[in-house]
Amino acid sequence: MNNEHAEVMEMHMPTEKIVGQTDLYSIKSSTVRTPDAMPRPIRVKAREVNVFYGSKQALFDVSIDVPERAVTAFIGPSGCGKSTFLRCFNRMNDTIEGSKVTGRIELDGADIYDGSIDVVELRARIGMVFQKPNPFPKSIYENVAYGPRIHGLASAKGDLDRIVETSLQKAGLWNEVKDRLHEPGTGLSGGQQQRLCIARAIAVSPEVILMDEPCSALDPIATAKVEELIDELRENYTIVIVTHSMQQAARVSQRTAMFHLGYLVEEGPTDKMFTNPEEKRTQDYITGRFG
Amino acid sequence: MNSLIVATLLLILIGFAYQVGWSRSRQVAPAGGRLHSRPNYHGARVAIWALVPALLILGLWAFFSDAASRAFVMAQLPSDVRAMGGSELAQALSRIEQIATGFGVVGEPAPYESAAGQALREFRNLAFALVVAAAAGTGALGLYLARRRIAPRLRARDEVERVVRYLLIACSVVAILTTIGIVASLLTEALRFFTFVSPIDFFFGTVWNPRFSTVGAGTGEYGLLPLLWGTVMIASIAMLVSLPIGLMTAVYLTQYARPNIRNAVKPVVEVLAGIPTIVYGFFALVTVGPFLAGIGDLVGLDIRATSALTAGIVMGIMIIPFISSLSDDIIRQVPRAMRDGSLGLGATQSETIRRVILPAALPGIVGAFLLAVSRAIGETMIVVLAAGNSPYLRLNPGEPVSTVTVTIVNQLTGDTDFASPQSLVAFALGLTLFLMTLILNVVALFIVRRYREQYE
């Protein structure tokens, strides 16, 4: 930590005892499943990652381990770099003009920024769900079939049908749309669209799914459905989710990382982060003192 | 001179009325209370009330002054001159007019002419003074009445807003009326043409041979099809050239080019749109035509220097910036989220463009295409110079053709008698052209509008 951060900490330093903590805990304990007891193998490993947009540095020396088949949540106030960091994992920052990433990010031990890595293949292994539901202006079926088609995952028409069906089932959308697969995906409700986007991501059988504030454009009921889905998906996928909502992080994640001003403040098991964080800034943010 | 005086008087009237309204509203403002409208609205309201009646009087005079002067002159003329009638009377009237305006006439004016001219001049001066006085009087009356109504609760702001709205409506009506006027004149003249030639012969005839009216009697043959075919062929060639090039330019500029390249390339492409079409025309005639003919020689094809191919290719080049800048706007309207969604699934950039961006932009691109087609159909200068002006039904694009626009030019240049079918056919052709572009524009607008709704 440098001086700048010490200052920020001072600014937000609470002098009295923490309030609101019990409320938060009650929300969490009522909805979340039992957290993992066993440590899981590491799937994605980031070391000293820096991101620059032009001359402006957005992320400073972030190192983190993402465990397999668990949900890791990135929290922090707006502009703290959590989305930027997430977009490093599937190299979506490459599409932004003037961006530069330094450091190492390993997927199963291989550096994804190495010259020999094929970005197309990487993005097939690390899927992404965006902040706003962004179905293509095509039918529901075509939306899900898009990925398998471009990657040649289905050789026969029947295979494609099967992939579409299982993906929609895994995304919990099958029963709602099975009778109208050929209607436009843009005609669905916001929550359904977001689950369609999740189905679209699942259809290419990724190993890791990145979610960039997937519920920020949804109402509470649709949010609850998507959260339920995320909880189910972690049986099979490694999930990294960026969220503004601390309750959401508490509800769906097993590990939480707190970002502030481009730095990783603290990272650890979600339970511990929300009940007994080491850093004052985490505590302040979680209890709603800033951000 | 007179109009300058009137304009000055009107400006003074407006300024004075505004001032009166403004200060009166301050006077009537209750102590400590508030006016409904701010003083500048009261000022504007009084100015409008003063200006409108004055303008009405002036407008009426402008409308009736000619008829009034004529009636006055006729009353001055000796009865034998009045009885002449026809062109002699008209000539006498115009001589008198010239004497009255001080322009002078050829030869010695007859005594009655001088007298009438003198009288007319006096009449006009008097009438002008009267009209200006009447305008000033009604303006002052309007001002007075408007001022009297000023009260704290008077809704001057609403009145002014209403007038502003009428003013805006009036302006847009001008454009609509002009269109209606053009269509009406096209229609009436075209109908006159159809009294000479039956519409069936015109629309379905395959021979175009109007013969010049000076050559002799006989109306000739007016088959539209050879011209329509030439138009369609050249427009098709133009679109074949411009659509792929324009679209790919737009894709490159929006998806691939870095900002500094984009900033350099885009203006250069748009310079193409600023080149006058006549310049394209002689570019086609002098450079492209002979070049194509030379290539034809090399490969053993008979391509003429002035042909549908030459005109079509050059017209296509002219339309490239039109297509590329319209498509550019449309492609940029496709949300970035679409692109990211596709890239995030591991699609390559060209897959993303082909499978997501272009399909999403397709309705807009079709709209742009149709607008470009209607431009190609209406284009004149390039085809006049480079298409060869040969109105025969020919399938080979290497042969010269003629188009609807070229034929209109041919029929209306030189000595024309607007009562002959040779000239009147131009209006029927113009009407055909107008209907074609109208339909294309309506379809294009319809498609573009549906596209806009998609992302809102």
Curated annotation (Swiss-Prot), chain A:
Keywords: ATP-binding, Cell inner membrane, Cell membrane, Membrane, Nucleotide-binding, Phosphate transport, Translocase, Transport. The keyword Cell division does not apply. The keyword 4Fe-4S does not apply. It holds the Pfam family ABC_tran. GO terms for biological process: phosphate ion transmembrane transport. One of its GO terms (cellular component) is plasma membrane. Residues 44-286 form the ABC transporter domain. It catalyses: phosphate(out) + ATP + H2O = ADP + 2 phosphate(in) + H(+). ATP binds at residues 76-83. Signal peptide: none annotated. PROSITE patterns: ABC_TRANSPORTER_1, ABC_TRANSPORTER_2, PSTB. It comes from the Bacteria. Gene3D superfamilies: P-loop containing nucleotide triphosphate hydrolases. It is found in: Cell inner membrane. Its main location: membrane. It is a peripheral membrane protein. Its EC number is 7.3.2.1. GO terms for molecular function: ATP binding; ATP hydrolysis activity; ATPase-coupled phosphate ion transmembrane transporter activity. Belongs to the ABC transporter superfamily. Phosphate importer (TC 3.A.1.7) family. The complex is composed of two ATP-binding proteins (PstB), two transmembrane proteins (PstC and PstA) and a solute-binding protein (PstS). Part of the ABC transporter complex PstSACB involved in phosphate import. Responsible for energy coupling to the transport system. NCBIfam families: 3a0107s01c2 (TIGR00972). This is Phosphate import ATP-binding protein PstB. It comes from Chelativorans sp. (strain BNC1).
